[in-house]
Amino acid sequence: MQSEAELRSLLSRIDHRGYPDYKDTKGQYRFPGYVLSIDHVQGDPFASPSKVSVLVSGKTAGFPQELYCGKCQRIALQDELLRQFGRRAERFAFKAKGSGKSGLISVSRCGQEVLERTACQIQPENGNILLRMEIGFPANGRTINARELEKILFDFVPECVKASLFYKNLDAKRLRRIVDLAEDQEYIRKELPKRGLCVFVANGSVLPRESGISSRPMRDGIAFQSPTEQEVTLELPHKGKITGMGIRKGITLIVGGGYHGKSTLLKALELGVYNHIAGDGREYVITDATAVKLRAEDGRSIQKTDISMFINDLPNGKDTTSFCTEDASGSTSQAANVIEGIEAGTSLFLIDEDTSATNFMIRDELMQRVIHREMEPITPFIERIRELYENYGISTVIVAGSSGAYFHIADSIIQMDRYVPKDITVLAKKEAENFPQISVPEQLAKKPAYDRVPRPDQAFHGNDRIKMKTMGKESVMINRDTIDLRYLEQITDSEQVAALGYCVRYAQKHLIDGKKNLIQIVDELEEVMQNKSLAELCESTSSVSCMAVPRRQEIFACLDRYRALRLG
């Protein structure tokens, strides 16, 4: 390891040389209070910025252990330190001049959700803090401008580090509040199954968002108020008593007129699988962590999935116990999404009729009379929903605005009336008595088989070069194959997409052997991320600055949508 003086001398030596000579700076340098590591140097001022990291020892950082002793506390603290560093870095961005990306200083941009990221990691055993950033090494044309880089590395970065990664320079009360909030959120999440709940929405929550392109809370948004019949009070470790709506396990229907807030509530439930920052409005909207948003997904590929619970006797004779297609219809895609959700270990399905295949969700009495059951290959979801709960322990929350078919079988019915929820279970059930109930098959569906094994001929070996590119939250490309993730609505950050790409790549290089099935492969991927780190999925330190931990459910979904992965 070299000293900061040696780095300064090196920069002076390479000043005004050709840009490739910046490669000589790669290495570690000891600065007062931390170690600076130049992990990867860009080859051109217009290329992706250089990867730089700082390591602050736990003793120097000085954070009390109780702020990072548990996983939820550690993730919350990492998130806050990253935000603090990012705000400081923005003040210095492009103050060092030059061509291309010269002077850029950036870290991961955190949204409203609190995610575990590779950009800031605290080692729980000793409190060491590793923070990764990107820096555009300055140039004049394609000539090194070392004096400007010296400003960044010797003035700007040290100020950011000291202001955001040293406990003595931060607001201790604010940090305590952030960690306390994370502990309260984790407490609610653990309390849900004990109380027979799958969702909790606190009174006073603000669910509407600022706009379609902003996840910040709507200014003057109507505060949530639970129906009296569904109110639950919890005693949190730090906040104390909190009251809100508890959605019980089973079948819950959310109804109401258009624009009255049904989908807004469901959207909040979708993202309630994550913790949210203070001031978001959804801090105490907590959903079962395994919840999966279901929808139709026309055109997706399906490989060796047993959809016979819902679809049988296709006119083309296709086997639905091991169904394959490169262009799924709305109903077959939604059926596959249900089965894959069960395989991924979900305990809660979230469904909006607006994005569902109608023929998959319901089949009314008139249609059943005209098109007899033996002529219809689809068993609609309404006929299996109770079975899913009683035999698989999977609850369902459905948003409906056009069909009352689910009134008969719902355990709870909530009406959104001008953004205010009302419990109308008794009223709706009484009205439903005047309408025929959809018949349910007497025979239970055969339990789907989950023994899909990726073929090893699709694995990468040795030094095979693998190119990977992410396109926001939409997709990830591995070599020439694009994995379409547009309809995985619980992906909340592009860095989760990057992590999913690395999960696929790691599985292909290290886990796919023709023996392990998908469940075993995902188990091992989770083990790597939990027991080692997310960064372990990468092949070099130059690749680990932009990932956020994905859920198990999204890892499964990504593998299921990877057309190049052949399952046996």
Language-model region placement:
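Carboxylate/His-rich catalytic cores and anion/metal-binding grooves
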Residues: 193-199, 203, 259, 266-297, ...
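Phosphate-binding/switch loop-helix module in NTP-utilizing enzymes
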Residues: 322-356
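Conserved P-loop NTPase nucleotide-binding/switch module
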Residues: 342-385, 389, 402-408, 412-429
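Flexible beta-alpha connector loops of hexameric P-loop NTPases
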Residues: 300, 310-331, 363-378
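N-terminal accessory targeting/assembly segments
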Residues: 1-187, 192-196, 207, 562, ...
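N-terminal pre-Walker A segment at the start of P-loop NTPase domains
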Residues: 208-243, 278, 286-291, 295-302, ...
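Glycine-rich phosphate-binding P-loop
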Residues: 242-274
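Conserved NTP phosphate-binding and transfer environment spanning the P-loop NTPase/kinase superfamily
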Residues: 387-393, 399-568
